[in-house]
Amino acid sequence: MTKSNSSDSKKARAMLALTRFVVYLILIFLSALCLFSFYMLIVNASRTNADLQSGFKLLPQGSFMANLKNAWNDSSINIPRGLLNSFFVAGCTAVLTTYFSALTAYGIHAYNFKLKNAAFTFIMAVMVIPKQVSATGFVQLCYKYHLTNSYLPLILPGIATPVVFFYMKQYMESVLPMEIVDAARVDGSGEFHTFNRIVLPMLKPALAVQLIFSFVESWNNYFLPALLLDKAEMKTVPIMIAQLRAADYSKF
């Protein structure tokens, strides 16, 4: 019996080691693919337009600094200002989106009211509606209230993000026991104090993930800024990249 148990234990350890090896191998392969994308980004940045049209190459060329200088000194765009604008918009959007989505998820999770399920269903239904569907009305509203060439229409709508709300609610259901919230209420803690001092620290992993995702999504947003921002000093990086694509490629 002892020999049989020892044999089974060795087989289990061998299977565990094999499983870990396969998992690590897959992760290394996926990481290499991601790093290869960044590598090709640098390689293509070091090539001229004629080189890019000639075909695929793995080795960097010698035009990286010239391309960077041409893009940085291009009179039609202001890259430092564009980076600052994008950081401001994306940073504000990420912080506000994550906080208020977590607050909304807490309200749905912690309170029982008649229309709780209806409210959750409505928020989920909004998630399937493409933003392009309501873009015309939204842009007309911005023009009516003179909100063009302003970052408010880019930041405020992003606060109501059903995807982030859904993620935060599901995370709360797995890590936030209501007994902790009830104990805080018994001790006299207000709802906002409970949320900010007790609930949010328990959501740090989810908050970090959603901050990153929201920041990247806002940073890559081209659709609304292209419709609402006309002044050159207010344009974000995606708009400037589009301008570079439409510019004279012989310089790059």
Region locations from a protein language model:
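A structural signal for multi-pass alpha-helical bundles of membrane permease subunits
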Residues: K11-M15, T19-F252
